[in-house]
Amino acid sequence: MRFIISLLFVFTLIFNLAFSHIGIDVSSGTNESGFECFKQKKYSRAIIRCYESIGSIDTNCKPSIENAKKAGIETIDVYLFPCYDCGNPENQVTTTSHYLKDYLKDLDFLWLDIEGPGQYWSGSYDNNKKFIQGLLDSAKTAGFKHVGIYTSESQWPGIVGSWDGGKDYPIWYANYDGAENFNDFSPFNGWTKPHMKQYAGNINECGLGIDKNYWE
């Protein structure tokens, strides 16, 4: 029996290693050599900022996508950091999709970056919910393969209260514990299982500032 249990433990460990991955996200322009360095370090996903919280396209986005493709990064996502004070959430999504129209086939996810209660959002849960719903509704028909939400238990409730309107979308959450696993995740606002975790932030690697991410 002990032998069987040991075999099961080893099999589970190998399975988890085989089907877990690490990636990076960047908020600045990244050249081809940078992505080649990340690929050599076994990072297989790049998440690139394409819309800034000031309410405009990040023009580093398309060159960074091109460089990630040339370097052979397997999975490329983009993220949109919305500008609440700018209004018109639908336009922010369509502006992003139009900017990326020639790259939509190359992208896996559009992530909506929802963070910063009291800093990037109003003091009204209802107004914030309406804005986020506008982002989600527009994103569903904008041509992206998948749409997800970047947020955390320390951020989302402070923006929308107990609202669970994002629960049907994959969640990418942040907890800088340095652990490449989901053992720390606690369900909140309807989310019961994470898609991806940002486990380390503000790291300098390959000469660039990055955050590190884990997914299975």
From Swiss-Prot:
Task: Name the residues annotated as catalytic in the UniProt entry.
Answer: D25, D113, E115
E.C. numbers: 3.2.1.17
Where would I find glycosylation on this chain? N31
Q: Where in the cell is it found?
A: Secreted
Domain Ch-type lysozyme positions: 21-216
Keywords (A to Z) from UniProt:
Antimicrobial, Bacteriolytic enzyme, Glycoprotein, Glycosidase, Hydrolase, Secreted, Signal
Q: Does the keyword Transferase apply?
A: no
Q: Which reaction(s) does its UniProt entry say it catalyses?
A: Hydrolysis of (1->4)-beta-linkages between N-acetylmuramic acid and N-acetyl-D-glucosamine residues in a peptidoglycan and between N-acetyl-D-glucosamine residues in chitodextrins
CDD domains recorded for this chain? GH25_Lys1-like
Q: What PROSITE patterns would the database entry show?
A: GLYCOSYL_HYDROL_F25_2
EC category name: hydrolase
Query: What biological processes does GO assign it?
Result: cell wall macromolecule catabolic process; defense response to bacterium; killing of cells of another organism; peptidoglycan catabolic process; signal transduction
Question: Which GO molecular function annotations are given, in alphabetical order?
Answer: lysozyme activity
Q: What's the family?
A: Belongs to the glycosyl hydrolase 25 family.
- What is the protein's name according to its record? Probable GH family 25 lysozyme 5
Source organism of this protein record: Dictyostelium discoideum
